[in-house]
């Protein structure tokens, strides 16, 4: 059991739009203060775009109670100041919602995270969110600049699943690895500077069902919003704890969309 007096809770992102309780989740996580370390996911960024008037609210995301709550401004301004990347040097542990592209070393990943975090926490955040949607560019270069650079960074941290062997992102395939078209590989199957030196925890990829990753790579999305389980990893002894979803496997397709 999580005890905020002695434990630190790491959350892999997508705090919202994964069930009916987005408002309650944000209020609870915010109340935990320094006892929680989280990263933003793609659904969190989409919520911020809705909040900024850039994207429309989809009824299937069930965000209306949150958007109409009296403390919505406080919660969402808090949310947009949360990080894309968590690093614990003592544990040699890195966490990002979708993972870490093999094209980056840790210093690059940290700088890239800071670039997007700085924009999100500024008054100009709507300009970034307006340009966030899109799949290109899909290959990292230090020469990338402006909104194209920020779009690649947010895609890599929050949407990535597959890469080409050269590390180029594929933003289309979502199936389990055994069904993926050649030559695509899961990002974690391509050796990179970060995965060679750190453990990596990530969410986002429900069809993995927590399986098939190399040693030191922890896939924690086990499809709770699709009728699977909510999975927690206790770091000290690497023991997993699961909570069955209270939703049926035969979900109405209109209720939630993984992306």
UniProtKB/Swiss-Prot annotation:
Gene3D superfamilies (UniProt xref): 3.60.21.10
Classification via InterPro entries: ApaH, Calcineurin-like_PHP_ApaH, Metallo-depent_PP-like
GO molecular function: bis(5'-nucleosyl)-tetraphosphatase (symmetrical) activity
Keyword Cell inner membrane: no
Keywords from the UniProt entry: Hydrolase
Protein family membership: Belongs to the Ap4A hydrolase family.
Role summary: Hydrolyzes diadenosine 5',5'''-P1,P4-tetraphosphate to yield ADP.
Name of the protein in question: Bis(5'-nucleosyl)-tetraphosphatase, symmetrical
Organism field: Klebsiella aerogenes (Enterobacter aerogenes)
